[in-house]
């Protein structure tokens, strides 16, 4: 079972927009990097490479979900702006 949730896999329909925003929007890139760092940390915990309390793991998962929501909103906004 694949534990990782990379944005390109989560939102394949936004692949080009993700690539464009990573190089053109510093705020997006920072959130993108933070999302992937959280995702990597969660996977390391779930694979028992790193250790964390249940509370720490839950907080990290909530942070990842919040970042994913923010990034998705930004992707939708950029996609809608490109369509106009």
Feature map (PLM): residue ranges:
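Extended, charge-rich alpha-helical interface modules
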Residues: 1-84
């Amino acid at each position: 079972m694949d534990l990782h949730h990379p944005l390109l896999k989560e939102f394949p329909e936004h692949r080009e927009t993700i690539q464009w925003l990573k190089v053109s929007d510093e705020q997006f890139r920072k959130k993108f990097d933070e999302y992937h760092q959280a995702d990597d940390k969660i996977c390391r915990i779930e694979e028992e490479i790193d250790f964390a309390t249940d509370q720490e793991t839950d907080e990290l998962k909530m942070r990842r979900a919040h970042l994913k929501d923010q990034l998705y909103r930004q992707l939708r906004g950029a996609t809608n702006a490109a369509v106009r």
